[in-house]
């Protein structure tokens, strides 16, 4: 056995490195026991140690065992995300896209509609007296939704008659769908409970259809409804001087819808017959389809008519 000098069993390479035989290697371990124990201990640690654990992550990859806390947090977040219904970007944008209207007139609160706001007779009279007739007509358009005999019997001065919902599209829009009237509409009927709100809703439905590509924007965004209708307006003017009344009502008179003198006229209006032929009932919202056909054939559109809640006895 040899330690420093190679024996006959050892192999010496050309570069001078000696490869010890088994006897020389055993003798070397006896001479340097501590060094060999450290070496063997290191080898034992390496051979016995297991590779780092890897866990399957929720998104298909792997994470090391040292990141178990972070992995748990990620898994929880992922599960919460997956538990919620996914929605497209267009749906989210549509939900957030509400029409914002800056109503410059004093309105009645709380609001009862997303289409229009109500104003009182006092507010309307104040505007009519503050502005000249030309100034008022340049900014506003009064729409009387009562039947022609009611309108002719007495209406708000400067108001235009429009009682047929099927003509709303042609009244407010040109044949090419562009805006026809550059004024703010104010609707009313006898009580402003049925015909006035219906006409305002029809205007918004047609507006939405023609401007669907720029939703939620509309051509007629600011819309008003006269609270209490012509009945309340006429009653309010009774407290004014005669000179003031004639500037507000034209003629200074009031004809109710069920006036016995106009029974034959009332029967001519198919719109009213369709609504009073069936028992009236309360509802929060209803939809009926009205087809608007123009004789020129340039526009054929279908709108959904949405009515406000009404009373069982009301057909106005």
From Swiss-Prot:
The protein's enzyme class: hydrolase
Pfam families xrefs: Rhodanese
Residue ranges occupied by any Rhodanese domain in the UniProt entry: 136-242
Cellular compartments per GO CC: cytoplasm; nucleus
CDD domains attached to this UniProt entry: Cdc25 (cd01530)
Enzyme Commission no: 3.1.3.48
SMART domains, per the entry: RHOD
Keywords for the protein's UniProt record, in alphabetical order: Cell cycle, Cell division, Hydrolase, Mitosis, Protein phosphatase
Source domain of life: Eukaryota
Compositionally biased residues, Low complexity: 39-50
Disordered, as annotated region: 35-65
Catalyzed chemical reaction(s): O-phospho-L-tyrosyl-[protein] + H2O = L-tyrosyl-[protein] + phosphate
GO molecular function term, any single one: phosphoprotein phosphatase activity
SUPFAM superfamilies listed in its UniProt record: Rhodanese/Cell cycle control phosphatase
Ubl conjugation is among the record's keywords: no
GO biological process per UniProt: cell division; G2/M transition of mitotic cell cycle; mitotic cell cycle; positive regulation of G2/M transition of mitotic cell cycle; positive regulation of G2/MI transition of meiotic cell cycle
Signal peptide: none
Family per similarity comment: Belongs to the MPI phosphatase family.
Protein name: M-phase inducer phosphatase cdc-25.3
Source organism: Caenorhabditis elegans
Source species taxonomy: Eukaryota, Metazoa, Ecdysozoa, Nematoda, Chromadorea
């Amino acid at each position: 056995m040899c330690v420093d000098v190679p024996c006959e069993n050892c192999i010496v390479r050309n570069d001078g490195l000696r490869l010890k035989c088994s006897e020389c290697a055993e003798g070397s371990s006896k001479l340097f026991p501590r060094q060999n124990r450290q070496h063997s201990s290191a080898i034992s640690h390496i051979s016995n140690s297991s590779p780092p654990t890897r866990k399957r992550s929720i998104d298909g990859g792997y994470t090391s065992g040292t990141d178990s806390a972070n992995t748990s947090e990620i898994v929880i977040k992922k599960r919460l995300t997956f538990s919620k219904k996914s929605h497209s970007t267009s749906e989210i944008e549509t939900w957030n896209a509400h029409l914002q209207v800056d109503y410059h007139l004093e309105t009645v609160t709380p609001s009862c509609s997303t289409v229009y706001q109500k104003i009182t007779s006092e507010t309307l009279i104040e505007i009519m007296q503050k502005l000249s007739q030309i100034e008022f007509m340049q900014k506003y358009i009064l729409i009387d939704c009562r039947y022609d005999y009611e309108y002719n019997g007495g209406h708000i001065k400067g108001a235009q008659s429009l009682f047929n919902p099927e003509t709303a599209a042609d009244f407010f829009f040109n044949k090419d769908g562009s805006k026809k009237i550059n004024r703010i509409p104010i609707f009313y009927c006898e009580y402003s409970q049925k015909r006035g709100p219906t006409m305002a809703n029809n205007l918004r439905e047609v507006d939405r259809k023609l401007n669907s590509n720029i939703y939620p924007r509309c051509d007629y965004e600011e819309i008003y409804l006269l609270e209490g209708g012509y009945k309340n307006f006429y009653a309010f003017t009774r407290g004014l001087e005669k000179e003031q009344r004639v500037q507000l009502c034209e003629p200074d008179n009031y004809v109710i819808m069920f006036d016995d003198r106009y029974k034959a006229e009332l029967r001519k209006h198919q719109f009213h017959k369709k609504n009073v032929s069936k028992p009236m009932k309360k509802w929060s919202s209803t939809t009926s389809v009205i087809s608007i056909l123009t004789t020129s054939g340039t526009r054929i559109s279908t709108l959904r008519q949405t009515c406000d809640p009404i009373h069982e006895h009301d057909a106005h």
